Amino acid sequence: SPETIDLCLGYSNGLNAYIEDHGLIEDDIYPISGKDIIAGTMHKTPFFFQLPLFLGDLYFKKPSEIPPYYKRSDEIEKIKGSNVYALSPKITDKGNTILGINSHQPFEGELAWYEAHINSKEGWNMIGGLFPGSPVVLVGHNENLGWGHTVNRPDILDIYELEVNPNDENQYKFNGKWEDFESFEVIIKIKTIGKLKHKHKQMAYWSKHGPVIKGVNSTYAVRYSNMNNLLAIEQWYKMNKANNFKDWKNAIETLSVPMFNTGYADKEGNIYYVYGAKTPKRNTKYDWQKVLPGNTSETLWSEYELFENLPQVLNPESGFIQNCNSTPFQTTIGPENPSSENFNSNYGIETHMTNRALRAIETIGKDKKISYDEFINYKFDLNYSDNSIMAFLVKRAISILNENNKSEFDIDLKNQIINTLTKWNLSTERNNIYATLPIIAFNPLLDNSEDEIYDDLIIKRLVYASEYLLKHYNKIDVKWGDVNRIIRGDLNLPLDGGPDIARAIYYKEYKNGQKKAIAGDCYVLIANWNKNGKVSSQSIHQYG
């Protein structure tokens, strides 16, 4: 729309003014245009449905080696996660409506959140989180309503193997005929030393499906939802300016943003959840989790399922909704939960529950009257659920060690490990001396299902964790906060929380046996509408 174009132009003009005022002019990026802002959004969105990981593999791997999706152990996946909660007046002690927005992104870099409060005096009054380059707030609230997103994993990306003409590498077979690839030359600028850049010319190819990757083992094409849709910023802009649920829902129904779980609350006491997915209408005779044949129009989709057919929950009797990168089929408690039986398996909808989602159900879901302070405590909950993968791993490890007569550990160390695991109460409080060993051991396995975890792998991880702690601390019962650290400049402080905890912390190796927090609870905003509809909110950044 003209309004969105003006918005992007105004934002780019502001960036250019900043560049000029601060003497930061770089010929490669200056001047920034409104088109650059739109292109940036189109470039960043596919990061959330794993396109960069697929592209990296397509150059080298065979079709049978391409996974249907990537797990959190993969580097990009470690940074993605979020929690969103909404509580209606039915379960709050003062009849207020609470929205909890809790994004898990990197603490630093281009995908780190920053906060802005925009008040145009012309009907746009919004506060929340956004990424550098975004002209709109992506998660947050205005006077009347608010929302948060969490990353979901709908199947909105397909990979095709193309049959290339053995006599002409610039043709591929489609419906029995040889079709020419569209081709054009692109110039790629490669940074070398300092500000020096090398210009590399490369031919780019396109099939009826989308962009083509000529790999070592095969030639692939990629197709994903909204590949040519420029309207993501417009959708978010309309959500920013909406004054009521109807207007807001009209904006999100466009699905110009092709994914994300979204939790919503407003001053009228409405709460709402939707599993956002611009899901293609696909031929059910094919397995869409695998690489597809690109030689037939049967696999070439062009239409999408309707928004009204997505999993969603509006004003449940339980008075709350949550999503913590988990299945939409346990959004709340009670009969209003969507049923998996009503949705096509081609949608790729998740069925798993993260620990964060389990704990939300176990805390918020069991409390009939919740104060604001109690909600804050639930949001910063430090425990693994008894039904979590972590709890399963600990129980299984104890059982294996009690049954195992192998010599991975000497008898004293084996007994120490059993004692540590047995005494752990599943808390990640910083002074807990029993948490450190199992967290270091089992963190890489938390995205696995129980049937993917083998006894030998559990023992291997315990060997690693015990050797790590003995090397750096000369014992295995180390305070979790001595290892789990937040580091900023000269400050180096102990942290509560951990992987897949409501108070989420993800880390990397630092030094002297410490782990440096690099992602997790990076932006937390709690919006609170009182029973008269007046809003107040609190927010905090990862560094305070």
Task: Name each model-derived stretch.
Residues 1-12, 102, 238-245, 346-357, ...:
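Solvent-exposed, acidic/flexible segments
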Residues 77-79, 90-97, 101-112, 213-231, ...:
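Active-site-adjacent "gating/activation" loops or surface patches in catalytic cores
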Residues 257-367, 428, 441, 446:
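Hydrophobic alpha-helical segments
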